[in-house]
Amino acid sequence: MVGQRVRTRFAPSPTGYLHVGGLRTALYNYLFAKKMHGDFIIRIEDTDQTRKVEGAQQNLIKALEWAGIVADESPEKGGNYGPYVQSERLDLYGRYCQQLLDDQHAYYCFATHEELEENRQLQIKQGLQPKYNRKWLPEEMGGSMPPSVIRKKLDEGGPYVIRMKVPDYVSVWFEDIIRGPVEFDSATIDDQVLMKSDGFPTYHFASVIDDHLMEFTHIIRGEEWLSSMPKHLLLYEFFGWEPPKVAHLPLLLNADRSKLSKRQGDVAVEDYIRKGYSNDAIINFVAMLGWNEGEGSEQEVYSMEQLIEKFSLERVGKAGAVFNIDKLNWLEKQYIKNRPTEQLVPVIKPILLAELERKETMMPVDLITSEAYLEKVIELMRERVGFEHEFVTFSSYFFFEPDSYDEEAVKKRWAPDTNSLLQEFTEILATLEEFSAENIEAHLKEFVAPKGLKAAALIHPLRIVSSGVSFGPSLYHMLEVLGKETVLRRILKGREKITFSA
């Protein structure tokens, strides 16, 4: 394996959505492969046909590609090591399983579900770790089952599985890139089923066969697979193969340090896409769930290119990583604040066009969908929104008439003379040839000064009638962006709808 091109893989089961933990596993495999100028491969592990969900494979790959994780080889792309779907590789597993049978590293087992459960319950009652009791281990392999009985069962054609025979009294040791040396006693390892009664291999068997045949150099996966390693290493030993290097990632935890689960929040990548999170923020956030650049670095916002450059498995911790949604929200805001305006326009425009399909506007559609107009809205609102879609939804008054006015703000800001002041000031605004923020501000101050009023007497009512709300960006810049025609129309409508009430 020395000098071999680095090859990593993400091998999901098509059983539903892409979990954020799965996204992290895929990301770390991708980052490591790209940093090492190697290849990242997607393999679909669908050996458990009972859990297979129609369309899940396509959705998994679509979610990965949304995140910017594009495979060099996959079921869709193909490659030199296919097929990349395990259910299309069944003949391979059968041949290798027969080799283990011939070499007496595996045996037929005809135990029924009832027998297995009875044995399990008995061992639990005795305080023992549940394991198969080897009733069907043949005499020639150190068991008690006569070969004639096994042959008779095979001739009868009844259901059976094929189990690996775990050697007695051996220690299984390996070096984990993240955790260091790890050791298991073979006494704790069950005689794992390799081939099920339906002719499909188990995860453990198919995974080892494929990882070897596809020439993966590194296996990077979640901590939950750590206990499977001794079974996998024994299979490598049985076949005389060199195992790949391994790294087991820390668990993802809720804020209370319980294992991340749907009961305490969203765990599907699709949920975060639906809520409007950007792929940049999600990838940045997920990358830091277990990894950090190290002492001396204060950087928290990374592009994919920077992550590839700086990532290393040696900087991944062993302790569980807490999924902090506040951190994700903070990152989302950082990306919005720092992303060039010209990159945000093509993201926001489709959101606006979708809204225009649902709602009518009194503003010129050509104007409000133009790049120049959207750029002005972005510059005014980028410090105030948390998601890209909020440039349209949270800032809807830049595109649609207010359908209501903030009642509390009206109670607080409306005086007996507010409507008459608005009427007078409307006449001044109508005469402005240059409808700019500076010009509007100057004329407003000139208007209120002789009356002994503060600018706030008009600023707040103007904001309410123009936007429907009591908060937002600079009023004068907001009015400039809206334009004279829209502002005059909204002031008139506001005066008609809002009256002073003591």
Swiss-Prot record:
Signal peptide: none
Main location as per UniProt: cytoplasm
Recorded GO CC terms: cytoplasm
PROSITE patterns membership: AA_TRNA_LIGASE_I
Binding site for ATP: 262
Record flagged with keyword RNA-binding: no
Catalyzed reactions per annotation: tRNA(Glu) + L-glutamate + ATP = L-glutamyl-tRNA(Glu) + AMP + diphosphate
UniProt subcellular location: Cytoplasm
Role of this protein: Catalyzes the attachment of glutamate to tRNA(Glu) in a two-step reaction: glutamate is first activated by ATP to form Glu-AMP and then transferred to the acceptor end of tRNA(Glu).
Name of the molecule in the record: Glutamate--tRNA ligase
Encoding gene, per UniProt annotation: gltX
